[in-house]
Amino acid sequence: HLLLTTIAAVVLVGCATMQSQEKTPKVEPPSISIHKAASIGDIEAVRQHLAAGTDPNLKYPVVNPPLLFAVGYEIMTLLVENGADVNDIGWGMTALHRFADPKSVRYLVDKVADVNAIDKFGDTPLHKMVEGYLWQQKESVEILIAAGADVNALNFDGMTPLDNFLTNHIAAPRQAKLKREFENLLRKHGAKTSEELRPLDKEKAE
């Protein structure tokens, strides 16, 4: 009797487990691709993809992973928290080249994003950052420098971040003060133009 009771209990448990599994519906990915969902800010579609097991670093049918298409902080962090590689270069840039707002930059740095990674032009995130709108980028630049960004890295054209800044910001008179303050910020951390670096390189060689 004890044996029969034990067998019956095992059978009942097995049936209950099978019924439980049958009741749990399989999550299907949405019809929209995870790359498209990330690029248009459809966070629910991105969540559905991740729940369905879509690779957060998927590069098919495009070369870039979803992270480099992400619009906004929420989708960016959702992807990273689910395994997106913050240092994936894709077709020529990393997430730090893509996101410029201080909140995103700080988050990526905390996730050990490479602050000196180069894109397809040899630009570091700092090269790209100083090309943007000055009043938005100052804090982000300071975060990158504090995290170890090379203020005198040379891109493939032999330009430093300061070269990039001076080339891209031929400021209108009303922005002259802001431009001067931003240049002073870079120089305070040792930034130089490639022209200014040449005498230093010559001295080191001698």
Go through each PLM region and give its residues.
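Ankyrin-repeat boundary/"N-cap" motif
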Residues: 26-36, 58-71, 89-100, 118-131, ...
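Alpha-helical protein-protein interaction modules
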Residues: 111, 140-141, 145-149, 156-163
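Alpha-helical segment of the N-proximal tetratricopeptide repeat
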Residues: 33-45
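Bacterial N-terminal signal peptides that target proteins for export
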Residues: 1-4
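Ankyrin repeat structural motif
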Residues: 42-50, 72-81, 101-110, 134-146, ...
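C-terminal motif of bacterial Sec signal peptides marking the signal peptidase cleavage site
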Residues: 13-14
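Short, solvent-exposed mixed-charge patches
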Residues: 204-206
